[in-house]
C-alpha cells in the first residue's frame, strides 16, 4: 500500500500539480490519500509495514511537522519526500533541489536537534532563524493571510533591513561560553546549511555531524548590511568577520532584550525573547 500524505498549505496552498503527479506515480499501488493536517500522522504511519510506503507532499515545514509527529515512535515503512514546497532548503542541502525523484527521508529523521521556545520543545530539520529572518517569515505569513500568492522573500528582507526591523541587543551562549552583542541582525542555530529559500547561512555546517552552527550577524549599519546581505545566498557573508561570528557547538542559547519573531524551518513563532537549541 502507498499512503500519500499531503499538506494543503504547502507551496503557498497550491499543491494541485504535485498531487496530480504523485497520483500518476503511485497509481499502480492503489494509493490512499490523506490530509496530514486532519489525521493522526503518527498512528497512520505506525500502522504500516515495511512493504508499504509513504509519499509525503510538502516542503521544509511539512518535514518538520512529520518529524515532531513521529518523535520517539517506532515505524517500519519507508517515507519518501515528494518535492512540493516553496523553500525546499532540505533538498537543497542534499543537492537534490532539482530532483524529480522522491527522496527517502528515514535516515534524516533520526538524531534531530531540538529547540525550546516559549516553553515548547520542537524537533527541527534545517535551522532556527531569530531576528531579521524571523521577522521576514512573520511579515510573509501576514501577506499569505491576505491572499498574496507571489511573495519575494529577498525583497521583503531588504524592506525590513532598510526600515522595519530594529536590531535588538542580546547574548549568545554556545556550550557554556557567553558573548554579548549590542546590535544583532540575526542569530541562527543551524543543523543544515540553508534556510529562507536558499540562504546559505552556515556553509560549513554538516548535517549529521553531531554539532550545530550559530551564525550571529551583528554591529554593522544598514548600508554595510545591505551591501553584504546578497552574499548570504552563496555563503560568502561569513568572510565579513568584523560583523559575523560563526560558532559550532552542541547547545546554543540566544537571548534578546526585545521580543522578536523566530522561525523554525520556516514556521513562525512571534514575540520571542530567548530560545535554546541542542543536539544529543
Pin down the residues of each PLM region.
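Gly/Ser/Thr-rich active-site loops/lids in small-molecule metabolic enzymes
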Residues: 144-154, 197, 203-224
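Glycine-rich phosphate/pyrophosphate-binding beta-alpha loops
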Residues: 129, 133, 188-201
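ATP/nucleoside-binding phosphotransfer catalytic cores, i.e., glycine-rich phosphate-binding loops
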Residues: 176, 206, 216-280
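Catalytic core of DAGKc-family lipid kinases
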Residues: 3-6, 33, 72-185
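Short glycine-/acidic-enriched loop or helix-start segments at secondary-structure transitions
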Residues: 15, 65-68, 90-93, 198-199, ...
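Phosphate- and divalent-cation-binding pockets in alpha/beta enzyme and binding domains
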Residues: 65-66, 89-90, 135, 263-264
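ATP/NTP phosphate-donor binding region
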Residues: 1-57, 64, 68-75
Amino acid at each position: 500500500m502507498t499512503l500519500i500524505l499531503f499538506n494543503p498549505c504547502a507551496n503557498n496552498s497550491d499543491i494541485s500539480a504535485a498531487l496530480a503527479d504523485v497520483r500518476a506515480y503511485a497509481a499502480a499501488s492503489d494509493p490512499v490519500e490523506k490530509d496530514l493536517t486532519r489525521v493522526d500522522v503518527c498512528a497512520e504511519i505506525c500502522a504500516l509495514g515495511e512493504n508499504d510506503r509513504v509519499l509525503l507532499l510538502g516542503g521544509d515545514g511539512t518535514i518538520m511537522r512529520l518529524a515532531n509527529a513521529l518523535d520517539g515512535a517506532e515505524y517500519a515503512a519507508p517515507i519518501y519526500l515528494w518535492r512540493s514546497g516553496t523553500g525546499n532548503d532540505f533538498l537543497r542541502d542534499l543537492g537534490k533541489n532539482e530532483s524529480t525523484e522522491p527522496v527517502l527521508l528515514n535516515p534524516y529523521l533520526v538524531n534531530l536537534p531540538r529547540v525550546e521556545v516559549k516553553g515548547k520543545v520542537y524537533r527541527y530539520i534545517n535551522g532556527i532563524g531569530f531576528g531579521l529572518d524571523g521577522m521576514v517569515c512573520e511579515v510573509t505569513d501576514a501577506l499569505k493571510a491576505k491572499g498574496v500568492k507571489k511573495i519575494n522573500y529577498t525583497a521583503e528582507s531588504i524592506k525590513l533591513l532598510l526600515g522595519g526591523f530594529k536590531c535588538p541587543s542580546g547574548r549568545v551562549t554556545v556550550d557554556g561560553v557567553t558573548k554579548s552583542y549590542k546590535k544583532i541582525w540575526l542569530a541562527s542555530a543551524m543543523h543544515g546549511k540553508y534556510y529562507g529559500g536558499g540562504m546559505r547561512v552556515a556553509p560549513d555546517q554538516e548535517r549529521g555531524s553531531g554539532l550545530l552552527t550559530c551564525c550571529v550577524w551583528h554591529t554593522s549599519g544598514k548600508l554595510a548590511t545591505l551591501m553584504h546581505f546578497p552574499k548570504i545566498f552563496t555563503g560568502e557573508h561569513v568572510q565579513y568577520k568584523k560583523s559575523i561570528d560563526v560558532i559550532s557547538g552542541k547547545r546554543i542559547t540566544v537571548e534578546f532584550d526585545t521580543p522578536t519573531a523566530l522561525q523554525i524551518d520556516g514556521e513562525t513563532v512571534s514575540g520571542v525573547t530567548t530560545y535554546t537549541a541542542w543536539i544529543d
